[in-house]
Amino acid sequence: MKHMKNYTILTPDAAAALINSNDEFRGAVRKTLSTQIVYSLDSILRGAWYDPSIETLVRITDIAASVLAVGRSKLEGVESIIAPVEIAAWLKENHDKFFAVAHYVDCSRGALYHYEKTGRDTLSYSITAGVSDFIRDQENLKEKQKPL
């Protein structure tokens, strides 16, 4: 494990060991590695509702980043499916926005279904667009709240 600031970042090997030893992660695995990544991230995000402390959010986003790092190491040259890595990094710096982002990630499951049925990769676009939409919504809200 690598320690940075207040975060503990799992190496891809450590993340793989965690996934293999954890029923929740194993239950999240689907037909392809890309679905494993998204379902694992989805399960992690849902877990935060039961313990929404900052420490838990840090741990959850560390695990999410690690799960996705495993995917990146195994999917060389398939960058389009790995867009959620940036989401995990963004979440670490924006804990206050965590739950709204969880909603956008949850919305990505429709794109995942489309990917499994058609083989067309709308998955990474959907998740990335969801976070972009959230950031845009937050910026629009700030603009509306500025005094005239």
Pin down the residues of each PLM region.
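DNA-binding alpha-helical recognition surfaces that contact promoter or target DNA
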Residues: A17, Y39, S43, E86-A89, ...
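Amphipathic alpha-helical oligomerization segments
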Residues: K92-N94, F98, V105-S108
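A short, Lys/Arg-rich alpha-helix, primarily the initiator
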Residues: M1-A28, T32, A69-H95
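Short alpha-helical "recognition helix" segments of helix-turn-helix
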Residues: A28-S34, A100-V105
